[in-house]
Amino acid sequence: MTRAERAAALVEALPRVYPDAHCELDFENPLQLLVATILSAQCTDKRVNLVTKELFRVCRTARDYAEIAPAKLEKLVQSTGFFRAKARNIQACCAALVAHHGGDVPNSMEALTALAGVGRKTANVVLGNVFGLSEGVVVDTHVQRLSTRLGLTKNKTPEKIERDLMKLLPREFWTLFSHWLIWHGRRRGFASLPG
């Protein structure tokens, strides 16, 4: 079976197994998803959701994040790990949102990746799940591991894996494909093709 055939088989099988696959970060607006995704680096979605429950009560706007005392923000996000860097990135990101985007989250890859703490993965999460735009494939640890095990790529870096997946998958499945593999990785923990 070629890589293209494997990708096609997955696009056919995974929606039957995971028809409800979606982003498991809790959010109500683009800013909340942006902040939650920054916090999700090296952290579980479950932990992030516990943290953001309180964080989203304290900070409601980009200006709130930009102006909160750094020590207070660090304390709120401490349990997500790497909390000083994450707090610093969130504040710088939100200050840029206020200064350059009227406090709103932009809906382009270029504008998002220009923000502190926002790489392609975070931008793809926001674009795909808030704005319905498929600019790329989210490559987290599950997608990275399973794409290799399922023979979709031989590459090891997220950027190269993303490029390989974008070549193999129809654009309309880029966002969903990540959700399917993430759900598969979290629920099954192994990379057999679902039947």
PLM features per residue range, with description:
Residues T2-G195:
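Catalytic cores of DNA base-excision repair glycosylases
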